[in-house]
């Protein structure tokens, strides 16, 4: 029985996923297939490279090193400087273990939305560092805020436009069951509705009519995916973990709020760890109340936050 791991996006909300995955890595839980979407792609990279804490530190970087915000707008005239995050972080501020990643044996894919077709395409890379990073850039290139990324002769933007939670794709890849990490506390919370920005989208992507259609249909397709997820969860074929507290802004800059969501992801996964282990092994899940202690990594990072804030 093959189990896949699906990681939803959500920009800074991906810090919740980082907490969940750090707890899984501490317990040596790795799945043979992983698919990341948007910010979920960054989490997938650190999970496959087995770097506990890396994504959390990257998302909650000090303002002087952050890849988004007013500072970046003043420096590069963009609110989001993906080139800094994608091509600089892995070699400087937050070193990425390419060797472990490429030798992991895990099949990992990244969902990207093709501008020419409006469809989701899934990329993987097992040896080329630059191509891997370009794929990572494409999956999290937010419409209206980022330029399309050229890859293999076509252009791509955020994977969540065409497939926010690629459950069907994971099943097509041979997964019998899936673990899904969500970044929204409630399935009734819809993703960004780009139909509200119809005029802007039509103007900016007039050369990509299929992409415009994908933006307009996003919420409808998302709701269909949620219905499938709920069905699989009822059938015991999906293990879903999502925040149980009010979430933060997608571009939150308050380090303490960000760390609170990280700690929540970590401790929530800790509480449900035995339930997941039982589910992984096909046993009837048993809920185990294990509040535990605050993760040492979170405490260490809290100290970093205080130092960074002066």
Residue ranges and their predicted role:
Residues 1-37, 45-310:
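Patatin-like phospholipase
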